[in-house]
Amino acid sequence: MKRAITIAIVAGIAAVGCDDKKATNLAPAASSLAPSTVAPFAKTMKFAIDAKSSTSIDMPAPKEHIKAGTDAATGTLDVDFTNLASTRGEVKADLTTLSTKTFGDADKDKTQTGHARTWLEVADGEEGKLPDDVKATNRYAVYAIRSVDKLSATDLTKVAPTKDGADEVRTVSATTHGELLIHGHKVERDADVDVAFHYAPGTAADKPKFLTVKSKTPMRATLADHDVKPRDGFGKIAKGAFNLLGTKVAEFADVTLDLRANAQP
């Protein structure tokens, strides 16, 4: 009898240890990110992220290759044209617009889209309704820029323009270092990007109309870091669907940015 009790205690301790190990996979919890602000002495122009900016999401798993995306965003960028390394800003992708395009079948893609939004707790499921404050809290995937380096040019005014239709364009490549917040958990992430500044013909280098930001390589988000897992319509963990992770649903998502930001007066 004593031996049985001892075994049970040891098993219980082991189980707790496993749970603790799983818990440590979670990234630090956060409801928001600290503002991404430029240095006080920097001379910057503000750009507003165009509402139609988008992301593409690629999730290859052994049994299913999920393809998805978002098509709404918000945020701002503050750009110092003569010292691009001083650029700061925040981009927020609207996860309520996330849609999958895995199957090429409207009904199947609609169902999969519903599941994805439920896992992220940004929309009600087929059964059940999430509290509005939970959906509002999780609505955006947020990336805040903390530093910029590996610039192909640090001074935009010294970059020779090229032609793109009627526009003149000055392009630089860079690596941004920042924080990524998804589903209440934040991680540090880098983004390798190409930034193209568009001008009316003959316009000064510090007077662009808008800029675009496109990923050179995807930014990876790991589901476990952000506590993204199977959930029902009430936000409860759907343990019966855990076998999908790593088989039909990849354990990570590769995110590609396609942003436009318009110069502000």
Locate predicted features.
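Sec-dependent bacterial lipoprotein signal peptides
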Residues: M1-V16
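Low-complexity, acidic/polar, glycine-enriched regions of mature
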Residues: C18-P265
